[in-house]
Amino acid sequence: MNSHSPSLRCHAISLGCPKNRVDTERLLGSLGIPLTFIDYPNNADFVFINTCSFIHTAVQESVNTILQLVADVEELSEKPFIIVAGCFVGRYGEKILKKDIPEVDLWLDNKEIESWNEQILLALNIKSTFLVTDRIITTGKSYAWLKISDGCQHSCSFCTIPSIRGSLHSYSIDELVKESRHILDQGVKELVLVAQDVTAWGRDLPNNYGLKTLLDHLLVLDGLKRLRLMYLYPTGLTKDFLLYLKSVGEPFVPYFDVPIQHAHPDILSCMGRPFAKNPRKVIDNIRSVFPEAVLRTSVITGFPGETEGHHVYLSKFIEEIKFQHLGIFSYVAEAGTPAAVMPNQVGEKVKEQRKAELMEIQLKISEKWLKNFVGKRLSLIVDNVHPEWPELYTGRAWFQAPEVDGMVYISGPNIKPGELIEADIMESHSYDLVALADSY
């Protein structure tokens, strides 16, 4: 590759969760070279694919994406340099993958993430030309993810994350404040904090900082309009921490993403989450401090040993709690996890039936909740122009997280992505709202 190229054309693909997106953005910024991002691989100098392998479907998506990319460039006279990184490489190993997919030029294990940039520059035979190598934000000016730690201290019996990502590694306050300032200086309005367990941040640092210490540094930053916390492990939401969040007020938004995984204590014990086996208490604590709280959770249906009685228990729990947002996943046995070899595995048809029943319950909850906003005036962050109707925009109220929740479809004059606007809610649908904005 030409080491004197003024700008390299990069086609970047980030699979999986927002944490992967942050890794991709940090990596591309850390290369310290001028990059032009293009939508298709055909004209790229290099392609970077950051993979996921958390569950079987993520593994399959990673494999399909790599093979499709290889097929897309196969007939080109000048093929792009293909780089594949991330959890998929860490889980299956470069040696095996290199043999199975020889068309990939460079494999990068997620355990070597600190040296990804050096390995890429060496492989491309180029040198950094920038003194400042800040993260490249790819989500526009409305929001950005802030990954505050990697790895996990928990031992959930169904999860591959500790074996792939390792134990907890918190990023320092200085690193995160610097990165946040860089993000906000670009006009971004909302920071969304993510990790395998956001509440665990700082436990591995020398001074055993708690999350409150980090938030004290972030909430005062100029330009921050919203701060959202995702991936909150139930036991990390102590009454003391909730009272702290109440005291700080805006720009923190009382949106709580608390993955409970199940409601029945027997199943939670089998999941290796015995300390989280009273989700009702956690939710009651949240609502006692924040009556206006919006709750998101995720549950796994069809876990080994889940009986019809356990399923009914979970169904009634969801009906009673009325989570505003709910992710429902059918259990998948992941090789190497304790749950994969547990007795009483649930059949696929039963899993899918139970999932469908839970989704029907949640649909009714969501429809009823969203009807309450019709006729009200809300503050919205505008995310994007609608891909099919250029006079329509998509955005979010404070109670909607990017990419995982529903959205607000906005029409009106002089609207721009990245703006905070006031709009009247005109309609509600199953998971989305429709709004009309004022003239600006």
UniProtKB/Swiss-Prot annotation:
Q: Which domain of life is it from?
A: Bacteria
Residue span(s) of domain TRAM: 371-439
Q: What is its EC number?
A: 2.8.4.4
Keywords associated with the record? 4Fe-4S, Cytoplasm, Iron, Iron-sulfur, Metal-binding, S-adenosyl-L-methionine, Transferase
- Subcellular location field: Cytoplasm
The function of this protein is:
Catalyzes the methylthiolation of an aspartic acid residue of ribosomal protein uS12.
**Name assigned to this protein:** Ribosomal protein uS12 methylthiotransferase RimO
Could you tell me which species this protein originates from?
A: Lawsonia intracellularis (strain PHE/MN1-00)
- Gene name? rimO
